């Protein structure tokens, strides 16, 4: 039977399998080979017959028939004439679908330049010809001639001539002595005449000779483009087009609207312009029109083609009839509405529905309630099939009727179909993978979807009118994936931090908390119960209450599997919760024998999950939910206005603060303090007052009081119960209800001095209400901005990390990171245990005392190991990290560690990059948007002392101290550190001690915990003298460089260094304090390093010594107030995270020393200081830095500085950290800084997610030495690619290339990904595609995005496994086919096949 007939209803060609996609510039021959005919007329369709015009933009002869198997004139109809070309109308009889595939072309009368290669930066045409873009445009748009062949004249090649100059040159040299051309023909000639090989060699030679950096950059840029053309096989002249392809008509349709009008695609207008102008130009050339007219027409053709390719890129935008810019071919691809993001990455799906959600507390965790109406519609095909199978209907039509009439059989069948067929529920916005989960549907009446209350946290759903979408997985594979991977019962842990996400909230927490409360003097106190039955009996008969203190016997499984009973002091309520605990030897009653706040419930669920596994946990969660709801209902907790207790002392505290504020006002009026100081003091006072009122209120609300009549404890305050349990509300909200609202901010972010004294219970005055509206309104505006910003951050993160997939089990690297606890101001913010849990140990972890191996290298660090490590007192552990993983594509499982959402080692094919991006992006909306503006006392300056946090022995590193005249030990070095070692000599803690601090301990001293080690003045930076002697001043001229100011409040005068450069007379001054060796001041004391004891002063320095005073080493001679350094804006929240991921250089960034050495001062500039570091390593060159003169600089000449020390304080630029301290330091800096922002909001994110993103930012290397490779210094190359090329070079005995790792921001890194499809769909589509086409890039489809775009399974998860199997199968097929070809007998091939099958089975 004919294969075609078999294929009648599904005439689909077999899908082509391909491994990669290449993009290059289309040559004119290529364009003609695509085309089915030339379009000569601008007409579209005939206005009377509505049939396409011949040779027009919709011509049926060129593009194919309008109706299936029917020619235009109607002579041939039906399938039997397939493939015949009608002799009357010239149309081929075939499917009308070909009108989506067949292209046409337009033959241009004059060549035109392709605007992408002309204008898309860097302009390829201009760079290649080594002309400026302006010059090229002048030639292209017919303003100037260009000399293409100078001959023997004095003209130069590529010289531009205006009309007049051209005429003069003709007069002077004669017309045939030289050639000068104009327009795209000229550029075509120049490009076609280029000898690329020769140019490349010349450029390389020139590069080797040139020394100027600017010239090098220019040459490299040109050489890169020349090499791109050479490698890709593109010819430069193809950037000038002689034929233009016309896209198929069904992709630019003309649609009839009712009322006889037509809607058309903008492309038709743009094509029409090109055809009209081109035809006119042809006519003019035939008519031998004057040159000026022809040139004008050629320019118009060039402009029309420009508009077709990229409207608005050059000249004015071409608009349609309604003044709207026309959408050109480029606009079709660009942006959110373009082809990539709208159609290829954002498809709509069938078999889906959406409805409002309501709570379904009687559902099990793996179920959802699906309205019957929806289910009937969604599962239609399945129902039709079953009706047919059971004989209720014989055709689809009959089945349809039955379903429409809702016959009773249909409902029975629907029940059957739905049983165990999971559906997917999704709530927008889907910020992380838990936003889509699978459930088994339960049919319900009504029209709302029922959702299980415990999964609300994951979906971030509530029942105030939220809607959710339902999707039906159709194929067996999809159902399998939904059940195994996406079922809500399989997603108990949060992928971002591994904590349970199925946690009771609100009512459930309140019910459980109520159950676990203990009350004094309740009936039946002190009774003992032997089992739970007795207890229930006693509760029923009101012998005891839920909160009575009793003794209860709890039975549990022992380690040997036998029952063990134990007596606990507890309450009946807690025993009821304990009843639900799974029977497991590891789980004791202690975890419920406490107040069940939300935190404790979460810990309990986590504990149960770790010890009993998933199934038990799910059952336990469901039971706990039921119990919570039930007792929340029975408790009947509600609150009235009397529950908000206003503290009695409030009025007193407010009055005291008001008096203080008045006093500050008076001091300001008397001129004792400045406006700023007054503001800070008042704000500070009110802040403290608010806190104190809140504390008093909390004391009142928490207080336990007894009923005088019965002697029983009165019920707890309901508001306190809700807030304390974590069910709803916070201490802050309680404060606003019953304390005082406190200070409010203006829209600019400044704090308004007058606070809101009232609370909501008392009610606000009009003034207070007005002040409070500022903040509230700003909050709403911020939220809207925040959502957009956070979404964009997530999009950039996903884009940069989408190709990080677990692709190997173990890469076998010996590199890793060192993890230590994070300590902030003496507090441990992240313990070592938290940071290393679920990571792989790099080397054996040894016990510091016994030396025994706690954990072998390469093993996963589990909870039990963490306990051992912390017990042993280990302070740092080396672990493997995605950052140091050496897998070629993706990351290996060992370096990644535990899959946080499963609690097991990560599987191969897991898309860890996307998970990392989601984990960082999802909490983005919780971060703040504001930049904190801090001033004066509103912010508490760093602590001013240091206490020992461990007991042990002190060791001082880089000891450099002096005893000053008061007998204190003063720190004289800038990199001195105090270590505390325990009795085993192991470092417990290291503190850097700042310059000028007083220390109270010395080497070898034994310290106790809490003993003070050092203290310093946090408000000033001291300048100390290093030698004993007498003070002398240099260039301290009153009124020019110093001034005396009296402190009004104390009357003490102080001498202050002022800006001496402000006055022209003082421009040459260099104010300094010098130390004389003798009292007369004849000789200057020498420092022990050899320099003179001269201390330069900077502006704002306060002098602390008088002229001629005797000073000892370590005495303060001047001090610089830190106020100026402290009032800086701190970028917080989302902008800070974005700044770090984009690797931007912060404003006023720190300057970091690149080498260790000695500081010298060089000759300064007008407003810059030159600082030179002479390296300790003789082989290195001295390094110079320029520092703005007014900036605080605290080194003196001759000081030692270590590599990585800050020469100038500020936020370091991440690039500097990478260049100076290396990858590990950069990683720990970025991880800690990003974590700090999230920690402030109480968001937990595992470090490994940030490390995965940082890994993606560090993929590139900048070539410094090209060796024998083909690279040019300055090239950015993929790190792994470079390693491979170097391995080959070394193997061949050649010189490898070397380079430095460079840090790219996430946007830049996404655009530089090896896949051009992924980069084009991200941002700057035209630029990416232009670049890819010129260099003939090949996309090997490694990442997720490219595969989604070309419509294949993604190479992650199950898709990865399938494609792997396919790949192996394809290789084997080839082997067998080859064998069959080679040998005439088929036996060998059969034997091979049997072997292969056996091999697969054994695997």
Swiss-Prot record:
Binding-site residues for Mg(2+), renumbered to this chain: 462, 464, 466
UniProt keyword Metal-binding present: yes
Cofactor: how bound: Binds 1 Mg(2+) ion per subunit.
Binding site for Zn(2+) 2: 811, 885, 892, 895
Binding site for Zn(2+) 1: 71, 73, 86, 89
Top-tier EC class: transferase
Required co-factors: Mg(2+); Zn(2+)
GO cellular-component term (any): DNA-directed RNA polymerase complex
A biological process from GO: DNA-templated transcription
EC number(s) per entry: 2.7.7.6
Source organism, top-level taxon: Bacteria
Keywords for this protein: DNA-directed RNA polymerase, Magnesium, Metal-binding, Nucleotidyltransferase, Transcription, Transferase, Zinc
Substrates-to-products reaction catalysed: RNA(n) + a ribonucleoside 5'-triphosphate = RNA(n+1) + diphosphate
GO molecular function, one term: zinc ion binding
Similarity annotation: Belongs to the RNA polymerase beta' chain family.
Described purpose of this protein according to its UniProt entry: DNA-dependent RNA polymerase catalyzes the transcription of DNA into RNA using the four ribonucleoside triphosphates as substrates.
Subunit architecture: The RNAP catalytic core consists of 2 alpha, 1 beta, 1 beta' and 1 omega subunit. When a sigma factor is associated with the core the holoenzyme is formed, which can initiate transcription.
HAMAP family xrefs: RNApol_bact_RpoC (MF_01322)
Full protein name: DNA-directed RNA polymerase subunit beta'
Natural source organism: Bartonella tribocorum (strain CIP 105476 / IBS 506)
């Amino acid at each position: 039977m004919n294969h075609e007939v078999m294929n009648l209803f599904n005439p689909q060609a077999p899908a082509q399998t391909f491994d990669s996609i290449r993009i290059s510039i289309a040559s004119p021959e290529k364009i003609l080979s695509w085309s089915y005919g030339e379009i000569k007329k601008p007409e579209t369709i005939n206005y009377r017959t509505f049939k396409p015009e011949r040779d027009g933009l919709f011509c049926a002869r060129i593009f194919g028939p309008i109706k299936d198997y029917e020619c235009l004139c109607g002579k041939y109809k039906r399938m039997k004439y397939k493939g015949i070309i009608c002799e009357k109308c010239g149309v081929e009889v075939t499917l009308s679908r070909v009108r989506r595939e067949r292209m046409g072309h337009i033959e241009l009368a004059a060549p035109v330049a392709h605007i992408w290669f002309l204008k898309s930066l860097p302009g390829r045409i201009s760079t290649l010809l080594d002309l400026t873009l302006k010059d090229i445009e002048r030639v292209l748009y017919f303003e100037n001639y260009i000399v293409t062949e100078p001959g023997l004249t004095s003209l130069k090649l590529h010289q531009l001539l205006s009309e007049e100059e051209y005429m003069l040159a003709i007069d002077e040299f004669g017309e045939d002595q030289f050639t000068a051309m104009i327009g795209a023909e000229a550029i075509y000639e120049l490009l076609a005449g280029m000898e690329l090989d020769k140019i490349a060699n010349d450029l390389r030679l020139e590069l080797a000779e040139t020394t100027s950096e600017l010239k090098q950059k220019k040459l490299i840029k040109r050489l890169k483009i020349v090499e791109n053309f050479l490698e890709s096989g593109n010819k430069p002249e193809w950037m000038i087009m002689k034929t233009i392809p016309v896209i198929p008509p069904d992709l630019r349709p003309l649609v009839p609207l009712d009322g006889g009008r037509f809607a058309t695609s903008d492309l038709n207008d743009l094509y029409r312009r090109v055809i009209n102008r081109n035809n006119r130009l042809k006519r003019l050339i035939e008519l031998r029109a004057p040159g000026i007219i022809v040139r004008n027409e050629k320019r118009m053709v060039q402009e029309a083609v420009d508009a077709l390719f990229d409207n608005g890129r050059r000249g004015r935008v071409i608009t349609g009839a309604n003044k709207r810019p026309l959408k050109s071919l480029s606009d079709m691809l660009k942006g959110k509405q373009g082809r990539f993001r709208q159609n290829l990455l954002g498809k709509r799906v069938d078999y889906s529905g959406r409805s409002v959600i309501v709570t379904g507390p009687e559902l099990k965790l793996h179920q959802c309630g699906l309205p019957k109406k929806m289910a009937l519609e969604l599962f239609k095909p399945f129902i039709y099939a079953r009706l047919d199978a059971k004989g209720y209907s014989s055709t689809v039509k009959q089945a349809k009727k039955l379903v429409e009439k809702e016959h009773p059989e249909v409902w029975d069948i629907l029940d059957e179909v739905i049983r165990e067929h999971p559906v997917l529920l999704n709530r927008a916005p889907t910020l992380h993978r838990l936003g889509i989960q699978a459930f088994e549907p339960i049919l319900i009446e009504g029209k709302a979807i029922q959702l299980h209350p415990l999964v609300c946290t994951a979906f971030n759903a509530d029942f105030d009118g939220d809607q959710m979408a339902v999707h039906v997985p159709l194929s067996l594979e999809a159902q399998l994936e939904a059940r195994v991977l996406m079922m809500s019962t399989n997603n108990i842990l949060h992928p971002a931090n591994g904590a349970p996400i199925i946690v009771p909230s609100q009512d459930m927490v309140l019910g459980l908390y109520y159950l676990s409360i203990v009350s004094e003097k309740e009936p039946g106190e002190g009774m003992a119960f032997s089992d739970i039955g007795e207890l229930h009996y006693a509760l029923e008969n009101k012998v005891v209450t839920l909160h009575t203190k009793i003794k209860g016997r709890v039975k549990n499984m022992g380690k040997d599997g036998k029952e063990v009973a134990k007596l606990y002091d507890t309450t009946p309520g807690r025993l009821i919760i304990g009843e639900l605990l799974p029977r497991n030897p590891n789980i004791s009653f202690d975890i419920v024998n406490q107040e069940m706040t939300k935190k404790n419930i979460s810990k309990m669920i986590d504990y149960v999950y770790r010890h009993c596994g998933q199934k038990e946990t799910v059952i336990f969660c469901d039971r706990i939910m039921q119990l919570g709801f039930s007792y929340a209902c029975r408790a009947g907790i509600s609150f009235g206005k009397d529950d908000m207790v206003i503290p009695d002392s409030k009025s007193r505290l407010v009055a005291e603060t008001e008096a203080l504020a008045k006093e500050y006002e008076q001091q300001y009026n008397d001129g004792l303090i400045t406006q700023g100081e007054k503001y800070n003091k008042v704000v500070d006072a009110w802040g403290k007052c608010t806190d104190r009122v809140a504390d008093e209120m909390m004391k009142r609300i928490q207080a336990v009081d007894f009923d005088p009549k019965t002697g029983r404890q009165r019920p707890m305050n309901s508001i306190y119960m809700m807030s304390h349990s974590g069910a709803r509300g916070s201490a802050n909200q309680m404060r606003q209800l019953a304390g005082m609202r406190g200070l409010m901010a203006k829209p600019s972010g400044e704090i308004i001095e007058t606070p809101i004294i009232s609370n909501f219970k008392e009610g606000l005055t009009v003034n207070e209400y007005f002040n409070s509206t500022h903040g509230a309104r700003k909050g709403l505006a911020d939220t809207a901005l925040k959502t957009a910003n956070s979404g964009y951050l997530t999009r950039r993160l996903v884009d940069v990390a989408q190709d990080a997939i677990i692709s190997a089990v173990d890469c076998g690297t010996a590199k890793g990171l060192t993890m230590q606890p994070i300590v902030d101001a003496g507090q441990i913010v992240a313990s070592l245990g938290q940071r290393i849990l679920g990571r792989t140990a790099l080397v054996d972890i040894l016990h510091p005392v016994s030396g025994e191996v706690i954990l072998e290298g390469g093993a996963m660090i589990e909870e039990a190991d963490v306990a051992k490590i912390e017990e042993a007192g280990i302070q740092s552990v080396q672990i493997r990290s995605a950052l140091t993983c050496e897998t070629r594509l993706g990351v290996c499982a060992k370096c990644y560690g535990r899959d946080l959402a499963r609690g097991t080692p990560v599987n191969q094919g897991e898309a860890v990059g996307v998970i990392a991006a989601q984990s960082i992006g999802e909490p983005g909306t919780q971060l703040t948007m504001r930049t904190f503006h801090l001033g004066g006392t509103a912010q508490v300056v760093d602590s001013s002392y240091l206490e020992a946090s461990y007991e042990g022995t002190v060791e001082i590193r880089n000891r450099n101290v002096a005893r000053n005249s008061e007998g204190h030990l003063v720190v004289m070095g800038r990199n001195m550190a105090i270590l505390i070692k325990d009795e085993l000599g192991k470092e417990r803690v290291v503190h850097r001690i700042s310059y000028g601090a007083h220390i109270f301990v010395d080497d070898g001293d034994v310290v106790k915990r809490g003993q003070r080690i050092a203290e310093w003045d946090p408000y000033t930076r001291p300048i100390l003298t290093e030698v004993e002697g007498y003070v002398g001043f240099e260039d301290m001229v009153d009124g020019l460089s110093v001034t005396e100011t009296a402190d009004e409040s104390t009357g003490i005068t102080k001498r202050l260094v002022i800006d001496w450069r402000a006055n022209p007379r003082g421009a040459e001054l260099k104010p300094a304090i010098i130390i004389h060796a003798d009292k007369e001041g004849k000789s200057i004391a020498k420092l022990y390093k050899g320099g003179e004891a001269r201390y330069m002063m900077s502006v704002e320095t306060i002098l602390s010594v008088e002229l001629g005073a005797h000073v000892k080493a370590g005495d303060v001679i001047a001090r610089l107030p830190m106020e100026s350094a402290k009032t800086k804006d701190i970028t917080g929240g989302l902008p800070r995270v974005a700044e770090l991921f984009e690797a931007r250089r912060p404003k006023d960034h720190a300057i970091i020393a690149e080498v260790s050495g000695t500081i010298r001062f060089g000759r300064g500039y007008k407003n810059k200081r030159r600082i030179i570091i002479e390296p300790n390593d003789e082989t290195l060159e001295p390094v110079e830095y320029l520092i703005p003169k007014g900036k605080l600089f605290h080194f003196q000449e001759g000081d030692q500085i270590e590599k990585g020390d800050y020469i100038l304080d500020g936020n370091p630029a991440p690039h500097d950290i990478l260049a100076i301290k290396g990858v590990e330091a950069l990683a720990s800096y970025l991880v800690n800084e990003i974590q700090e922002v999230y920690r402030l909001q109480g968001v937990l994110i595992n470090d490994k997610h940030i490390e995965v993103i940082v890994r993606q930012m560090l993929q590139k290397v900048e070539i410094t030495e090209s060796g024998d490779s083909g690279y040019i210094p300055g090239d950015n190359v993929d790190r792994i690619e470079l390693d491979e090329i170097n391995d080959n070079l070394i193997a061949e005995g050649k010189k490898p290339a070397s380079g430095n790792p460079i840090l790219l921001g996430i946007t830049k890194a996404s655009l530089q990904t090896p896949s051009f499809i992924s980069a084009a769909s991200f941002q700057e589509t035209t630029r990416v595609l232009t670049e890819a086409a010129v260099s003939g890039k090949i996309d090997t489809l490694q990442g997720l995005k490219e595969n989604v775009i070309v419509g294949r399974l993604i190479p992650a998860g199950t898709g990865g496994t399938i494609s792997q199997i396919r790949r192996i199968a394809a290789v084997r097929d080839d082997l067998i086919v080859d064998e069959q070809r080679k040998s005439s007998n088929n036996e060998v091939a059969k034997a091979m096949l049997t072997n292969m099958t056996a091999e697969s089975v054994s695997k």
